[in-house]
Amino acid sequence: MDKKKLSESDICDKFIRPAMEQAGWHGMDQIYREFPLRAGRMVVRGNKAQRDKSTVLFADYVLCLKPNIPLAVVEAKDNQHAIGAGMTQAVNYAQLLDVPFSFASNGDGFVFRDATLANGVLEQNLTAARTQQSLLAEALVKNES
């Protein structure tokens, strides 16, 4: 299978989600796909109002500690992009959710950003997704210092 020919959605389904599940994240209550971040702008015309669907904002994935307690954002890109091409978007989404951890991936690996700087490194390349326990440990290290 040529990854370069796969869509972003295919990369999510075939590579990114399985990597997160392999790292111990539970698909039913910890991995949320197309997580809504902002409902979008309301457009009013006369007596009618509706949301402008083009302004609705979704994260590709949000990893949650428990339901509705987000811990990290994962932004996916198709394999024609670099691994970290979605990092700026992931960081912006993480700021909206007020979470310290961001990932970007094109299915070949992950770029991980730790805004807590718990281990003194802001961004690093990873071959696999981080576990929930490792993210919690970094968050706790930062809170203790």
Regions found by a protein language model. Give the residues of each.
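ATP-dependent helicase/translocase motor core
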Residues: 1-145
